[in-house]
Amino acid sequence: MPMPPDDSALSLLPDHPLAAHNTFGIAARARFAARITQAAQFEALHRDPRVANLPQLVLGGGSNIVFTRDFDGVVLLDEIAGRRVVREDDDAWYVEAGGGENWHAFVAWTLEHGMPGLENLALIPGTVGAAPIQNIGAYGLEMKAYFDSLVAVELATGRRERFDAARCAFGYRDSFFKREGRGRFAIVAVTFRLPKQWTPRLGYADVTRELDARGITPEAATPRDVFDAVVAIRRAKLPDPLVLGNAGSFFKNPVIDAAQFDALRARAPDVVSYPQPDGQVKLAAGWLIDRCGWKGRALGAAAVHDRQALVLVNRGGATGADVLALARAIQADVRAQFGVELEAEPVCL
């Protein structure tokens, strides 16, 4: 009697081009690539002699990575799909999505099914599985606000583990998976808790201005109104990666203490800032970069976008080294002029 097919078996793609798998469009290559469509494939990796001893990189939408060289290992393309309501109670829906689901499509799906909450995070590039790694955020909302739990596979052992918010240790564009857990886990599913009592988050002036331009008051705004406003803002400010390669916001907004902020404001009274609950102050990195004269400037084939100084772009043929050189030049100028350190959001490999 024939053996049933092994659903965990990997089909390896040798010398695989990665330009289509990173939103910068950088033409790196991987020694091997493999498309992962189910958690069992991640769980079986450590038993596969072809890849068990190779460096491994889990890649979703490729919107948070800069390849500075070819990857001499196996790139695991996370394509695990699925969306479902796993349970609900009187207060909330608990919605699970596969790690390979497109983030924006998932947000749109929750709204279409009457489960709002994530609309401020619309149009952020990448996958559901990448969202907790970065604790993605925009327009006054971080993903952690609606996070319930996730399931991840430890690549070295194939062990499946559940992480709650405490174990994920979320920070500003940060989590356990960017620190101690970096490179160790593949996120296969994420569950979100979406409250049935919806409260709009309209603290950002860009959002209220866009609503006002549409004739919508904050009091009358629906979840769909907020979603549409955020999509319109992002499309106006950020270039389409399919047209102009980029990774969205390249730098984190730096957070400094009150004393450093007072000194900075004495030199630059119009500095754009956002007070934080702990007494620290978040600065607008785009404003700092613009003040240093970088908006629209280029180094080789890498450039600063002419409408959004926080976005670095590939004008065509840029290498990862070009992007990194531009980023370092910007960091040096901001440090020299303002005494502030800018930290890159994407992972540079």
Curated annotation (Swiss-Prot):
**Domain of life, per the record?**
Bacteria
Q: What do the Gene Ontology cellular component annotations say?
A: cytosol
Question: What Pfam families does the entry give?
Answer: FAD_binding_4, MurB_C
Report the InterPro entries cross-referenced here.
FAD-bd_PCMH (IPR016166), FAD-bd_PCMH-like_sf (IPR036318), FAD-bd_PCMH_sub1 (IPR016167), FAD-bd_PCMH_sub2 (IPR016169), MurB (IPR003170), MurB_C (IPR011601), MurB_C_sf (IPR036635), Oxid_FAD_bind_N (IPR006094)
Q: Which Gene3D superfamilies match?
A: 3.30.465.10, UDP-N-acetylenolpyruvoylglucosamine reductase, C-terminal domain, Uridine Diphospho-n-acetylenolpyruvylglucosamine Reductase, domain 2
- Any GO molecular function: UDP-N-acetylmuramate dehydrogenase activity
GO biological process terms, alphabetically, are:
cell division; cell wall organization; peptidoglycan biosynthetic process; regulation of cell shape
Which Cys-Cys disulphide bridges does the record give?
none
Pathway in which the depicted protein is active: Cell wall biogenesis; peptidoglycan biosynthesis
Q: Where in the cell is it found?
A: Cytoplasm
Question: Reaction catalysed?
Answer: UDP-N-acetyl-alpha-D-muramate + NADP(+) = UDP-N-acetyl-3-O-(1-carboxyvinyl)-alpha-D-glucosamine + NADPH + H(+)
Q: What does this protein do?
A: Cell wall formation.
Indicate the family of this protein.
Belongs to the MurB family.
Annotated NCBIfam families: murB, PRK00046.1, PRK13903.1
What is the protein named?
UDP-N-acetylenolpyruvoylglucosamine reductase
Supply the source organism for this entry: Burkholderia cenocepacia (strain HI2424)
